[in-house]
Amino acid sequence: MKKVVVFLTLLLSVVSLSAQNSDPGLSFTEASDLTILGKVFPDTPKPYERMDFERFGGWEKSNVNLLEMSSGIMVCFKTDAPEIYVKPVFKELWKYYPLNYSNRGFDLYIRKDGEWVWAGCTGYWKGVEKENGRVKPLVKHMESGVKECLLYLPTYSKISSLEIGVPQAYSLEEGDNPFRHRICIHGSSFMHGTGASRAGQTVPAFLSRATGFEFCSLGVGGDCMMQPQYANALKEADVDAFVFDAFSNGSDKTVEANLFNFIETIQSAKPGVPIIFMRTIRMENRNFNTRRDDEDTRKIAKAEELMAQALKKYKDVYLIDSNAADLNHDTTSDGTHPSDWGYHIWAESVKGPIIKILKKYGIK
């Protein structure tokens, strides 16, 4: 009898949770059945991960952890609904900076008069067990008419399933790709989006909306040191150009060990494709920390030395400046990573040079 009572209690709990996490007035569509953008490798076996681990190997545990995250992935769809909801199932919710929308939330933009305008966001602040399948609104009380929507997925969490919901009387369908050309942007936690308040406030996101190019993000936390496994995968990427934030992680030793092999591996399969390296930004944690200042000075000097050689040695390789600071140098979120405004400044600082280089290759 006691076992029966326990079973019935558990059953009632499941039914209660199911009722809490569903809405009979909504119709849901799996996001992977819509238009998925922003991925260097679009056809990964798991749609909300950024690497095809079956196709490419040689990964370290830290690589896999970061590449399973959904940073930079966008869902494009159209709807005439006045309300839009999300219903995710997470494999993992990022445990650091738990109240940050970029790490654990969804960020929605809607095109208005030809411009992408922020529309709404929502976050999932509790553990996976409590948040999986929980329906939350992105935006409500919108005017009638079809909206072209762009939804950014969390930067540091891992997603197993994502459903987008609208009231049953309305439609939701695949959107047309609003971007032209595919540009791979691979880099450190700066490109991954650490420090951004929302997933749409990263450098790749800013650049995509500002230029109309599809900047496909492969930001990998503190793990971007031009390692061979990344080069071997990137050389197979179906993209029109590469932009690299390659000198923010690592040290002078990793720059020296990996730079030339990284370029040569990619160019072996992608001759004639532009490869644009961005100089790293000046991190504000150098201001009074002499050890950090010395480490960064040596790394930057080595990058400058070797890039001077690379520009002479290889065709289609470029080096451009980047900046994420205002005049007061007060745009950092934590001493290392920029704030939203800092990332916007960074995107603006590289936008013109990137566009100018791409025009040489008919990419415009």
Place the predicted regions along the sequence by residue.
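Short helix-loop-beta junction
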Residues: 204-217, 309
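Bacterial Sec-dependent N-terminal signal peptides
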Residues: 1-22
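Catalytic nucleophile-elbow at a beta strand-turn-alpha helix junction centered on a G-D-S/GDSL motif
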Residues: 180-204
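Substrate-gating cap/lid alpha-helix
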Residues: 283-321, 364
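N-terminal secretory targeting modules
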Residues: 16-182, 351, 356-364
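Oxyanion-hole/transition-state-stabilizing segment in secreted/luminal serine hydrolases
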Residues: 207, 224-260, 265, 280-287
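A short helix->loop->beta-strand "cap" motif at the edges of active sites that frequently abuts
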Residues: 270-275
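Glycine- and acidic-residue-enriched helix-capping/strand-helix junction motifs
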Residues: 95-99, 193-201, 297-301
